[in-house]
Amino acid sequence: INLNSITRGISRFESAVLIFDRLKNRGIDVPGSEDIAAWVSTASELSTASLQQEVLRSGSLALRKLQEWNNACNRRIQALEPTFKPFQGVEYSLHQLHTVADVAVVSAANESAIASEWARYGLATHADVIFGQEVGSKANSIASMLACGYESRKVVMVGDAMGDAQAAAANGVSFVPILPGHEAESWRRLQEEALPKLLHGTFSPEYQATLLAQLRSVLHG
């Protein structure tokens, strides 16, 4: 689940539900997993705050365990040494994008973690706004931006997962993939090929289909 699969990029809560489902298919039933699945399928946002509210409301032991695991994940992420850097071409591409467009970060991670990471690597100056898990789904985040007056034909979602493509499609905006394993080339293509097409109105459905096919080809499942 996740890194090199078709489910890459989904939230940790959605990942947990998928794991429970696959365990159940193998005859292993995790007690309380139905409480977690019910919350994930009905919550307006899959965030730490939303989970806390549901734990208090329901008193579910399974959700309380999910909360403990979620908090432990957050602590470990905060404690990670900054050993990884942005892929080659990211900073330059974001700089180029920001000279001609507003840039928003749309993520399933929590906003404080995103802001900290972008600041650490000197990328924060290239983003105008951050939409984290607190805002809701990625599709909701894009919809919020469109509600501010942006034209869908002038908006592009950049991401490395099918969930990003689906969020873009749900709002009628273009999508450019960052192909896992080919990140540097993908960022260069965004800057040199995809962005000019968007700016000149030549980002065709055929071009979009080609990009989506390329992303599907590098993911399994």
Which residues does each predicted region cover?
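Alpha-helical substrate-recognition element adjacent to the catalytic core
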Residues: 1-109, 206
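C-terminal cap/substrate-recognition subdomain and adjoining C-terminal extension
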Residues: 82-102, 109-221
